[in-house]
């Protein structure tokens, strides 16, 4: 896999961060500008929908509208067009994620790891964002403003995997996963704060979300449009792939991907075998599927685009661009 990844550091107030993102987009992917700013023409219903989405942002994702407005100003388009064209584009992913709690880590700290699988048609952009009044964070971007995952400067880790992937995306009023992930990174310091934020958050998506904090707490939040299950953990490990496993949500899906079950069982088997280290978690990420999490099936939306690791005590984030079983794709520290 030969692709170019981008790392951006964005600092300043939300509007200036939005403008900087627009400049980066215009420079790196000028063909993508039209995705965000396609005009509505005479379709007044889309304008009204954009206005409604901005109002939802104001309530549930405070501060995000200012970023969108700066982005729109720089591109010379309307904020309503930007929010409509990002919120209505379906995105998902075939991912694996695990958090090891201090009693099961040889370091006595909280260790996190995840891989993200999709096709080669992706943003491939890691961002560090520092906006006054919010937690600074580093994570992979989706549609500029959203996040697939990340670690903030308060020691909170967030990662996601799509759940119930064979079900059609619901048409209920709500956000895609990336808005929830970004808002947790911006606003939360602990697992309990993340659960409190996520519980009422309107979601038009089927999601497995794992959060962990530097105090040795973690939780798996399985969330759909009309139900949510939460499993808290302070010992052992917690993990997820692409299906629901908790009471209250696991009956949601009537069909499951075999590769999701295979990866879920593999992680559990290897994690139970012994206490974990950053190196042992890296081995999970860098061993080829099915006896590992590194995948190369890009034409089937199942190729590893990146892997992340973090030790929440020292706040280090390690990213591998591309599948981790390729020797040239080393982990870099951010």
Please report, for each region that a protein language model flagged, where it lies by residue.
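Flexible, glycine/proline-enriched loop segments at strand-loop-helix junctions
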Residues: 54, 167-171, 178-186
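A structural signal for short, well-ordered beta-strand segments and their strand-loop junctions
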Residues: 100, 111-112, 159, 208-212, ...
